A protein has these predicted regions:
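Surface-exposed extracellular loop regions of Gram-negative outer-membrane beta-barrel proteins
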Residues: 235-286, 415-530, 595-597, 603-609, ...
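Short acidic, glycine/serine/threonine-rich loops at helix termini
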Residues: 208-210, 298-301, 395-399, 443-447, ...
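Alpha-helix capping and helix-loop boundary segments enriched in small/acidic/polar residues
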Residues: 262-263, 306, 361, 404-411, ...
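Short amphipathic alpha-helical segments with coiled-coil-like heptad repeat character
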Residues: 52-60, 185-187, 294-299, 306, ...
Length: 899
């Protein structure tokens, strides 16, 4: 282990010296001088710059090409002006075009960024890391994003209120925008200096030109902006917006005989309120009471055979907006101290029922209210505080006699997140911290008899009066962290790190369940450094990461470092943690081809390596990966990669059993696509892997088809096929006398999915969108076996196959007579599965005035278990097209008051 670690360190640090000579190209910062309107009439936003106010400042031009041929004159020039008053910032653009008839005027929803567009970015904090982006297309479609991490993150969920108009003439096109200062954040000073950048996209040539040159080898985006001067005596505007909403919802479905909960339809009325209150210009308080997210698309279907939880992206507007402030990813991309999907999650406790019972269970926990205090001050303080309360959720159970009772399936819960960062050293350094807490009200009463029939309660139901909540859920959970980043040498080099700690408390049963969960698996039979302690009522763990590298300057980029997650680290109450008990070392190297040639516009090659260990010192995994990307001159592209995993050991494959060795694995992928600007474009790809001796194979085939027959209409169809074959897929654990048997089998799993989208933009404020996704996954098992030597190199030595005399079937289970004495030793259920699902959304969205919307939504869903003997396409016909779907119709109306 030590030898390999030294080799990897040498591999990384040798690159450091190799790359030191590459420096970022020095560029002079441009300055734009604006003027106030004062006694002039404010511009009317109509796409015609004919008001006298525009004569207060000259045009600024001299744009420079950024893509594809950086630092050359662009094909078409661009000019702009900026003026302001005490309430608004006004920007006028003149996008010259010698072939005005070829201007692309594609329509889309907000943030679609289709066709020709022009964009202004404002770093109002002048922190060289964050900014506000406003984009307007030639067709008049808005785009707006909040920029963070020096251009590495663009958050399209930020939707401020602003105004725009465009016109087209024989010399090009005009754009005019008006931005309320209340939608921007800046400090109070006599003269403001903001970072400024303007970018234009010439669609037909896929050319981008900029006002302030940003070299291709620059270490970021916002840090390279020019400056906006002349903003005198403008007062920060406190934002005050209140947005009430009302929702009606009708659910229809096939009625079930005898089930009073499923009579064919349900009708609901709901109302709530959202608000934005500017505490200062820098800091905003967001409030939501009884929020509704009926217009949000459902999550894509997925099946996890490895037992781990699946990470789903946040789509709910309240939690998406300003999420960058609360982001605290400390190890890999998913591990985070704050995973907002925990708030309003599906109930975690199952109501105890019999086969004759009917149930009515909530799909999600109700968010009673949430408050978010966030922003960034002129002095470099980033602040984020979030508080939310979800209600106590009850499931209703009805027995065969019609008696009803209620069971608590989710307790009243309070969630808190606090985040703080401070910039130093001319914004080249920051340090920060985070704290989270979760408190659950785990009361004693779980069962409520609605018919006052406690005296007739069966012994089975009486057992439910024990506090199942306390035995299943942790009562309190706390996490905290510190992080930092330092950049030097014009931000070309960096070092960053973080440290996290967690502490969870609960009953002995709840903490035992935590210890034995897939994240921890303290019950592993061969682990000497962890063990289940059923008397414990708390766990405390740590984690962290340290990375250093080169992010700009010349053609080379690299970084390397390590992270760790201790065995007792637990984040899943309000964060996301897939696996604890891991230490990882990593090294990455990239080479960027910065200058286009006759063959390509841009290209890159990357090599990376990482190794993992556990806290017992076991060397578990190593991977080498080579990646290449090329964007050809005609805007087609290819992405290719391959890698090798010569060492694969898993502490989780046997779900609490001993450490397991897998055969060496080699994988590859190839994707290529056509010019995405064309009316019809496509992407096709393949990725797959092969283990030694074909112990494991995986193949995935991907097609992405996009067609835009009209400027206002686009259609996409994205089918995908996955074929997974594994000779040792874990099935279950059974006892053979005093010996546990870890049973695996040969699985052949085929998964077919597709997504289908239609977007029709009637005008920039009125859109119709359809989304549909069929999903079918079928898994068949054979050649069942048990593990007898989990660390053997060859598969045949790792497992023992059951022979025909040892295994037989009974009903829907397998019966094992391992010692051939004619008696059943143990049995397990048939693990074959066929899951079928169809989801669709049809959404009509009308922004009837800026910030106020009407949504009409029609959602459909079909879920079921298919026939494992059917072919995939037959399951599509029988289980989806042949079933009556569940329908949901939603009307949601919002109105935004700006006070």
């Amino acid at each position: 282990m030590l030898r390999n670690t030294l080799i990897h360190c040498f591999f990384f640090f040798s690159l450091y010296g190799f790359s030191q000579s590459n420096d970022t190209t020095k560029v002079v910062k441009r300055i734009y001088q604006t003027n106030p309107i004062q006694d002039k009439e404010a511009p009317t936003i109509d796409g015609v710059l004919d008001e006298a106010a525009w004569d207060l400042v000259p045009w600024t031009a001299d744009f420079i090409e950024k893509e594809p041929d950086e630092n050359t004159p662009p094909s078409q020039q661009t000019k702009f002006k900026i003026v302001y008053d005490q309430k608004y910032l006004y920007v006028g653009f003149r996008c010259l075009d010698t072939e005005a008839e070829k201007i692309e005027k594609r329509l889309s929803r907000r943030d679609g960024f289709q066709g020709d567009w022009v964009e202004i970015n404002l770093d109002t904090y002048h922190d060289k890391r964050t900014g506000f982006s406003f984009t307007i297309t030639a067709a008049g479609v808005k785009g707006d994003e909040f920029i963070s991490r020096n251009g590495n993150n663009w958050d399209g969920s930020w939707n401020p209120i602003w105004y725009t108009a465009t016109t087209i003439d024989e010399e090009g096109w005009w754009a005019e925008i008006k931005i309320p200062l209340s939608q921007l954040k800046f400090g109070k000073s006599k003269e403001q200096i903001w970072g400024l950048q303007v970018t234009r996209r010439l669609f037909r040539k896929e050319e981008r030109s900029v006002w302030q040159r940003v070299p291709q080898d620059a270490p970021g985006w916002v840090s390279e902006f020019g400056e906006l001067h002349g903003l005198l005596n403008i007062e920060p505007q406190k934002q005050l917006e209140i947005q009430p909403f009302g929702v009606t919802q009708l659910d229809t479905y096939e009625a079930e005989d005898g089930n009073s909960f499923r009579d064919g339809e349900d009708f609901k009325l709901n109302a709530g309120i959202d608000a934005k209150i500017g505490i200062t210009n820098d800091l905003t308080l967001d409030l939501t009471v009884n929020p509704d997210f009926g217009q949000v698309e459902a999550d894509p279907a997925a099946i996890a055979l490895d037992g781990f939880q699946i990470f789903f992206e946040e789509q709910r507007p309240f939690f998406v907006e300003n999420k960058n402030i609360f982001d605290y990813r400390f190890a890999n991309n998913a591990d985070n101290l704050f995973y907002s999907r925990r708030i309003g999650r599906s109930p975690q406790v199952n109501a105890s029922t019999t086969d004759d019972d009917f149930t009515d269970l909530p799909k999600n926990s109700t968010i009673l209210g949430a408050a978010k205090f966030s922003g960034k001050t002129k002095k470099g303080w980033s602040i984020g505080v979030l508080e939310s309360v979800t209600s106590r959720e009850l499931g209703t159970i009805e027995d065969a006699l019609g008696n009803r009772r209620e069971a608590v399936v989710e307790p009243l819960t309070n969630y808190f997140v606090g985040r703080l960062q401070k910039d130093f050293n001319e914004r080249n350094t920051y340090v920060g911290g985070i704290f989270t807490s979760v408190h659950r009200d785990l009361g004693d009463q779980l069962l409520i008899d609605l018919d006052n029939q406690a005296s007739d309660e069966s012994s089975e139901l009486a057992g439910l009066r024990e506090n199942a909540l306390a035995s299943s859920l942790r009562q309190r959970a706390y996490t905290g962290g510190l992080d930092f980043r330092h950049n030097w040498k014009d931000r070309n080099y960096f070092i960053e790190g973080n440290f996290v700690a967690s502490h969870v408390e609960g009953s002995a049963e709840a903490i035992t369940e935590t210890q034995t969960s897939i994240t921890h698996l303290f019950q592993r039979s061969d682990a000497s450094h962890v063990a289940v302690d059923s008397s414990r009522t708390s766990l405390t763990g740590t984690g962290g990461k340290l990375t250093a590298g080169k992010s700009g300057g010349g053609n080379w980029r690299y970084d390397g470092g390590f992270y760790w997650r201790s065995p007792e680290l637990e984040l899943n109450d309000i964060g996301f943690l897939r696996q604890a008990d891991e230490i990882q070392q990593f090294a990455n190297l990239r080479y960027l081809f910065l200058r286009p040639t006759k063959f390509y516009r841009r290209a890159e090659v990357a090599l990376n390596q990482y190794s993992t260990f556990d806290f017992e010192g076991n060397y578990n995994f190593i991977r080498y990966h080579l990646f290449g990307f090329i964007n050809y001159k005609n805007n087609w592209w290819t992405e290719v990669g391959f890698g090798h995993k010569p060492r694969i050991y898993s502490n989780t494959a046997l779900r609490g059993g001993p450490r397991w060795r897998s055969s060496d694995d080699t994988y590859a992928f190839l994707f290529f696509g056509s010019d995405q600007r064309k009316k019809f474009n496509f992407t096709v790809g393949y990725d797959g892997s092969r283990a030694a001796y074909n112990d494991y194979t995986f193949d995935r085939f991907v097609v992405r088809l996009n067609y835009q027959p009209l400027d206002a209409l686009s259609v996409s169809f994205n089918p995908e096929l996955r074929i997974n074959k594994d000779k040792t897929q874990y099935v279950t654990t059974e006892d053979f006398g005093e010996t546990p048997r870890y049973i695996t089998g040969n699985i052949e799993q085929n998964t077919l999915s597709a997504s289908f989208r239609i977007n029709y933009t009637i005008n920039p404020n009125l859109t119709l969108q359809y989304y549909g996704q069929p999903f079918i996954s079928r898994g068949r098992y054979s050649n069942f076996n048990y593990v007898n030597n989990p660390l053997a190199k060859k598969l045949s030595d790792r497992i023992a196959l059951y022979n025909p005399n040892q295994i037989s079937t009974r009903d829907d289970e397998y019966v094992i007579d391992e010692n051939n004495d004619g008696q059943e030793d143990y049995s397990f259920d048939n693990p074959d599965f066929a899951f079928v699902q169809f989801r669709s959304n049809l959404v009509l969205r009308w922004e009837y005035i800026p910030g106020s919307e009407i949504f009409l939504v029609w959602s459909q869903g079909v879920n079921g278990d298919g026939d494992t003997s059917n072919k995939l396409l037959k399951s599509l016909d029988n289980q989806i097209l042949g079933q009556k779907p569940e329908n949901t119709f939603v009307l949601k109306v919002t109105y935004r008051f700006i006070l």
